[in-house]
């Protein structure tokens, strides 16, 4: 037994001496839950931002405490001037509530696991794909304007989402039925042929300009209650030609105060019961007469 102990001690001693001469030094092992910054954040500029702002003890890793402390992340081009092409690794910040990466060069963004998000601003990011949180009970605002997104899927009900801006993308369809709290919606400059707002009865502001394939826009209160709707702009703003909208129905929308639908192909305008209307602009359409007496 003594010989065995001596052999083990000698072996350990040799290992320590060898390590010392090899210049290896103590082996750093990250504690459970810690995140290595270099291997996790692949974009050099994003990695630099994370290191500077969140690695408080400058040890090259993010501890659970450091990660949990991150509730806001702003790398918008107006705030952080360095270009970022990927936010890979952002999913480690599970306490994140506010994310602004607008104006960057991010082709794809996946925030599926960030369930505490309240606000997302990823406008003007060159996005082609975007994945929403799988669950986000507090998510109130999403801005994805000026990208190249072709599809957006709301996999669950986002009961707190009040503002959605997807202006200037390449969407051909969008299902808004899981956004019951929506107050402000901007879907302008997309290729939507159908816009179903029957489940969005809290909607107050609607922007759907230059919809080149949308022929019928029914936002009446006939089949759904749209009495909260106060502002609608479905004008055609592209140079040359007219918009595709032929029929516009705002019947029964008693809260509607402003309706702008210039330069479309409208020949049928139903607005019976829109008794609060103060501003009506429908120039450049095919309407022969308008009855505003009802």
What are these regions (language model features)?
Residues 2-12, 16-98, 115, 137, ...:
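N-terminal capping/linker segments that flank leucine-rich repeat
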Residues 73-77, 99-101, 120-122, 140-144, ...:
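Conserved hydrophobic beta-strand positions in leucine-rich repeat
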Residues 127-128, 149-150, 171, 192-193, ...:
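Short glycine/acidic-rich loop motifs that flank beta-strands on beta-rich extracellular proteins
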Residues 288-294:
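Short, intrinsically disordered, charge-balanced linker/junction segments flanking boundaries
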């Amino acid at each position: 037994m003594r010989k065995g102990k001596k052999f083990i001690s000698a072996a350990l001693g040799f290992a320590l001496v060898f390590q010392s001469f090899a210049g290896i030094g103590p082996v750093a092992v990250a504690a459970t839950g810690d995140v290595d910054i270099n291997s996790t954040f692949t974009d050099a500029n994003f990695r630099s931002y994370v290191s500077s702002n969140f690695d408080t003890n400058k040890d090259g890793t993010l501890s659970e405490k450091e990660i949990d402390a991150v509730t806001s992340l702003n790398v918008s081009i107006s705030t952080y001037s360095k270009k970022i092409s990927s936010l890979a690794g952002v999913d480690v910040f599970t306490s994140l509530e506010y994310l602004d990466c607008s104006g960057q060069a991010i082709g794809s963004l996946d925030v599926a696991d960030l369930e505490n998000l309240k606000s997302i601003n990823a406008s003007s990011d060159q996005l082609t794909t975007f994945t929403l949180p799988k669950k986000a009970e507090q998510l109130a605002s999403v801005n994805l304007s000026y990208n190249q997104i072709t599809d957006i899927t709301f996999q669950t009900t986002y009961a707190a989402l009040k503002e959605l801006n997807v202006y200037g993308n390449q969407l051909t369809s969008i299902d808004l039925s899981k956004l019951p709290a929506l107050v402000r919606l901007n879907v302008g400059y997309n290729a939507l042929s159908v816009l179903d707002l029957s489940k969005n009865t809290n909607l107050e502001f609607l922007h759907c300009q230059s919809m080149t394939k949308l022929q019928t826009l029914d936002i009446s209160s006939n089949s759904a209650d749209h009495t909260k709707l106060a502002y609608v702009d479905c004008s055609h703003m592209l140079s040359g030609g007219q918009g595709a909208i032929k029929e516009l129905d705002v019947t029964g929308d008693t809260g509607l105060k402003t309706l702008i639908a210039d330069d479309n192909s409208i020949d049928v305008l139903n607005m019976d019961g829109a008794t609060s209307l103060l501003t009506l602009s429908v120039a450049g359409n095919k309407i022969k007469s308008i009855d505003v007496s009802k």
